[in-house]
């Protein structure tokens, strides 16, 4: 019985700054605590205060902190975050400009101070691709949105790139802000927002909007018997078989392979293969893994040792595959050097668990 796989992409979204986003001459961007606004739009803070808008009292900066401030926010008073100019929220997790991504579209969103009275639009068209104001989900801010389908061919279309090696898909667009409707000034902003679709777990991504590639994963002993339970030192053959490989792709190889177990809501994880090579960690743990190329299917052979101490739960595999135009080449791996373990990763789907008894 092949394990069932979900077909979600891992999504991430980024916003990077291309032009200034804080300019104290713009309405809604004051210098605080007696700071003065300089000709160049930066604040000159009075002594004892710092930060882009002088909003941080230096004497309150905390070395020890009970909250985690994201995006280079600085902790003060032990549990508060002072955010950099592109982020807001209690722990600075909320960007002012960002994109919500799903499988079919990119929703570009922006928050602005209530005093903001300008316009936000995609750089390619000030008139045709304007973000419209919607009811704000954050009190004290205005909210703007524009939903652009991935396959849009109109003036608002997104820039799409596909990584030929990994199959990762990337959509990107530039968002302009003008603070005084109708005039673009040097103190207006430009940001790049993007959606990145990782092909991890997902095999090759030819087209995000039209993609249904299944990979069946089987765990077997050397005699092709499917196994559900193994003993220490048993050999496990893990086979990845794409069900509907697009034309032109003939080989499959395991790029990354991670073994994990969830017990009492804790994830124990070991990276077995990283960029096709066995990790130092794998070696330290005393088991072997090899990455075989077998034409149409990718195979890993593992030797089961007590993988996670004190863990009775089933073991699952998380993986990333590479699809090759022909038979995949065998990579010569460098001599092993220590590599960090993956941290706190959330697994999007699970292969069939094997119980190690
Ligand atoms: C900033 O303010 C201080 C006084 O608080 C002043 O001496 C200094 O010249 C100011 N800097 C600029 C660049 O205006
Ligand atoms: C997600 O997709 C639907 C169409 O299926 C679209 O209407 C919606 O706006 C999208 N949401 C986001 C956040 O992109
Ligand atoms: C966004 O703007 C930057 C800076 O002008 C430029 O390098 C980049 O190519 C632009 N990206 C898109 C998708 O237009």
From Swiss-Prot:
Keyword Secreted tagged: yes
Location within or outside the cell: Secreted
Signal peptide limits: 1-20
Listed GO MF terms: signaling receptor binding
Domain EGF-like as annotated: residue spans: 21-55, 61-93
Record bears the keyword Secreted: yes
Disulfide bridge positions per record: 24-37, 31-43, 45-54, 65-75, 69-81, 83-92
One Gene Ontology cellular component: extracellular region
Tissue specificity remark: Prismatic layer of shell (at protein level). Expressed primarily in the mantle with highest level in the mantle edge and lower level in the mantle pallium.
Main location: secreted
Record key words, sorted: Disulfide bond, EGF-like domain, Repeat, Secreted, Signal
Protein name: EGF-like domain-containing protein 2
């Amino acid at each position: 019985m092949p394990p069932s796989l979900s077909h979600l992409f891992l999504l991430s979204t980024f916003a990077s700054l291309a032009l200034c986003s804080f300019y104290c001459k713009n309405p809604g961007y004051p210098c605080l605590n007696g700071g003065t606004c300089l000709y160049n739009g930066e604040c000159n803070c009075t002594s004892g205060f710092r930060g882009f808008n002088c909003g941080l009292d230096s004497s309150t900066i905390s070395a020890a902190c009970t909250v985690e401030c994201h995006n280079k926010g600085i902790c003060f008073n032990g549990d508060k975050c002072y955010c950099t100019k592109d982020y807001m929220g209690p722990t600075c997790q909320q960007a002012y400009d960002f994109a919500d991504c799903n499988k079919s579209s990119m929703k570009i969103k922006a928050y602005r101070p209530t005093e903001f009275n300008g316009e936000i639009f995609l750089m390619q068209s000030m008139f045709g691709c304007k973000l419209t104001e919607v009811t704000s989900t954050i009190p004290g801010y205005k909210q703007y949105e524009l939903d652009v389908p991935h396959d849009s061919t109109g003036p608002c279309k997104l820039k799409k790139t596909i990584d030929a090696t990994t199959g990762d898909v990337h959509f990107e667009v530039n968002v302009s802000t003008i603070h005084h409707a109708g005039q673009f000034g040097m103190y207006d902003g430009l940001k790049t927002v993007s959606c990145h679709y990782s092909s991890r777990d997902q095999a090759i991504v030819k087209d995000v909007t039209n993609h249904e590639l299944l990979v069946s994963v089987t765990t077997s002993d050397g005699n092709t018997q499917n196994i559900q339970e193994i003993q220490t030192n048993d050999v496990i053959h893990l086979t990845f078989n794409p069900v509907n490989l697009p034309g032109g792709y003939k080989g499959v190889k395991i790029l990354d392979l991670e073994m994990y177990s969830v017990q009492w809501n804790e994830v124990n994880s070991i990276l077995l293969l990283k960029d096709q090579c066995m990790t130092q960690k794998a070696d330290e743990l005393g088991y072997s893994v090899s990455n075989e190329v077998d034409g149409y299917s990718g195979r890993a052979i593992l030797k089961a040792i007590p993988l996670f101490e004190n863990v009775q739960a089933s073991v699952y595999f998380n993986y990333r595959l590479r699809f090759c135009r022909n038979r995949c080449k065998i990579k010569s791996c460098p001599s092993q050097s220590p590599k960090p373990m993956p941290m706190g990763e959330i697994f999007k789907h699970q292969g069939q668990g094997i119980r190690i008894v």
